[in-house]
Amino acid sequence: DAAAWPDTVGRALLQDAYGSFLIQGARATRLWCLVQAARAAIRRGRRVLVVTGDVENAGRLAEALAAAGDRPLLLHSGLSARERAAVWQSAQDSSATILVGTRMAVFAPIDRLGLVWVEGEDDASLKEEQSPRYHAREVARRRACCDRALLVLASSHPSLESWSAVQQGEMTACVYRDPSGFPRVQVIDLREYSRETPAGTLLSPPLYEGIQEALRQNALAILYLNRKGFASVLHCGDCGAMPQCDACSVALTFFRRSNHVRCHYCGRTKPVPDHCTRCQSLKLEPVGSGTERIEEAVRRKFPLARVGRVDGETIRRPADARAFSRLLAAGELDIVIGTQMLFRFGLQARAAFVGVPDADAGLHVPDFRSAERMYHGLMDAVELALPAHAGGAVMIQTRLTDHHAIMAVAAGDDSVFLQQEQAFRQMLQYPPLTSLVRLDVSGTLEPVVAQAAGRWAALLRAEVVSAGNRGTNAGDGSPLPQRSTGFGGETSSIVILGPSPAPHAMARGRYCWQILVKSLSLEVGKEIVVRTREVLDRESRRGGLRFDIDVDPVAMA
């Protein structure tokens, strides 16, 4: 019961020592808990730091704290350099008791820190992908520890790393979820409706019926699809070739309304080609479904409905987001179609019907966290629906009905997902059960990049052998010894995987190869990486070579 939280956090703050909590609950519940914790810290003469992954959420958190009687500072990348400097100075001058911001705020010069709150702790945006790389959640943990403050990680669906910390006794979990607030969830097997579903639309008869029922009730319907554009790609009907980005060697996303194709990685756009560059055929056809294509199908099926689309094409500026929010709040939309951007709005109007046309999108990518991301996205979609007792329904379309993420969402039971996913991670020896370092070698000449990556891998394997880690079979990818105690094992075995071309082997005109270093001891893994990197730094760098190190990478693809 969340009503117990004020007493819980009050007792923890009385200790004047580092402590950590993991809160799982709906957005409104987490916000209430944040306000209670902030007030308790301020009453004890301590200051509060709140960190979240995106600018919009930071603004909402600051507004909520202000409405509760506090006047927080707000720090994020949307401010000008002068505005950020002013906020930084105010934080240093102790003129405000609360600072709210995106990941950069975790470094703000706040003294007397009593509470560090990380909202949406599973959000990948908390990881800075540019050098110097850091994860704001882990920096927050270190700050709280150094300042003898209380750390609270909060989310609707905590990361596997945080759940593992709870299981190891490193954090205390507070689960504040009301089962009565869940909608009715139905799973649709797309394989059973392949003939009845219009090609490329992913809109099966049951999904259409769900939308129709919401319209009959004059209620809101939402369709969530984490793929923008009219279709994923264009492909040649004769030879199968797809238009690709010249700089990144990845397929270009097709946008019908603006009649252009765009690279998802470098952002380059160009007009839709009128023929195949490989065989000169004129049969270029869209393949796959994006939000734009779903919107077209919905408008065709429900011509009188007021339809809105939320993705990177329609919401480009804060003003666009505000305009959409006003339309929604005024009840001027019947059907909303969107990507994950839907979850950034903090929608107040919950829908009578939420449909997920393609739950499997994003699952089949070379990233061991793909199932976890899919599960989190589905749970976010479920949160958009009204409770079952108020008529709320969610329909999830999939071709993988027995996937543990789908089964967990349908059952409303996190443990179904967590147990199976942890078993997979254990079997494949991936975080959080091991530590992972990704090494990227990039340059303008592919043969030089491949040679340098091979050299780095050879140096790493030599270090493994010289360190006496015979259990890893000279670092060739053999299994790590099993740990009986999970975290904190003393075994320092290391596995070297690769080198191999990166999932997207060329980006912005640079070729990239990767090496993965898995270890039971992160310190030992980092030690051999740093030592071998120093050797490479002393060697020549033909082809504009760059050697990058990413400890605990969040994005693998």
Predicted segments, located by residue:
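Helicase-associated low-complexity/disordered flanking segments
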Residues: 1-4
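Inter-lobe coupling/hinge segments of SF2-like helicase ATPases
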Residues: 6-11, 16-97, 102-450, 513-515, ...
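Short beta-strand elements
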Residues: 308-309, 464-469, 492-502, 543-552
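AMP-binding (ANL) adenylation modules
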Residues: 428-430, 503-506
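Short amphipathic alpha-helices in soluble, non-transmembrane regions
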Residues: 452-458, 527-535
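Intrinsic disorder/low-complexity segments
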Residues: 466-491
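Short, low-order "capping/linker" segments at domain edges
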Residues: 491, 505-518, 551-557
